[in-house]
């Protein structure tokens, strides 16, 4: 777990430069956006971000699926709000410790 205060401290120290705002789609994948950490701190963390509701109306290959009331080619694919749940903040392990210009360690397979 990561508190908003801890996140802000890491942002100010330059330890975090990107925040992923995401939700699970109908296949259980995380979808959303990567946002500048400072933009997240100053705006998105309080007010949310927008994304297309298309993300909730596609199959595993990202093809649109008929039958959804909120979105379709006939009704259109509108924007929806992603409101962060700040009680679910986490560090993403694969992104931890990477610095631009520095070599990334190998991942065991």
Kindly give the residue locations of the regions a language model identified.
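ATP/Mg2+-dependent ligation/transfer catalytic cores
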Residues: 1-109
